[in-house]
Amino acid sequence: TRLRLLTIQDLEEMVIRMFEEDAAPNLYFHNASLVRNICNQADLLSNAAQLPEEDIVNLKIAAVFLLAGFISDYQKPLDGALILVEKKLPEYGFSQGNIEEAKRLIENAFIGRNETMTDKILHDARYEYLGRVDYIKLTDRLFREMSEFGLKCDRRAWLEIQKKFLQEHDFLTDTARMLRNVPVEDQVKALSVYES
């Protein structure tokens, strides 16, 4: 398993290189920095949850590839991520079981289905930015990115959607709740100030 974890680091570097070299320059939000952050959070949360080794391997693979589909097809990032998982994992010596479980985790992350602890950890790793002090800057980057990729929405409507999302979102693991830097109410207030 130690060797596989080292191999996952190689996969992470490969995906980050793809973001840096092949991705559209206007991926202001879905970028190498966010991939690194999701991978780090998945690592931290899986260790805190004391997941079995095989679950950690599959979770880390899913974290690496979760956003990779944005490189090839912004409108269908899930499809792109799944294709990349199927293509790259055999090249790196991972089993069909790893491929299927990584794909399941990624699909569940995109549709918001949280059946297992690994699903919950990937969810919390993906949305960790909602509790960060630089949330406003990140949500602004997401708005710019989506606008340039065809989102028809003015800033005020966008901010209302973000407020609603913040209020309805919940971290699913105790560790993620504990690590949250900024409470929901403060983020919503910050959005209101930003809006005015």
Where on the chain are the PLM-derived regions?
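Short alpha-helical hairpin
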Residues: 2-21, 34
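Amphipathic, well-packed alpha-helical segments that form the structural scaffold of globular domains
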Residues: 16, 39-43, 86
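Divalent metal-dependent phosphate-bond-processing catalytic cores, especially two-metal-ion Mg2+/Mn2+ enzymes
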Residues: 23-55, 65, 94, 111-196
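Short coil/turn segments at secondary-structure boundaries
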Residues: 29, 68-76, 93
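His-Asp-centered metal-binding catalytic motifs of divalent-metal-dependent phosphohydrolases/nucleases
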Residues: 38, 54-73, 81, 103-110
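An active-site-proximal "capping" alpha-helix that borders the catalytic cofactor pocket
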Residues: 38, 76-92
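P-loop NTPase signaling cores
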Residues: 92-98
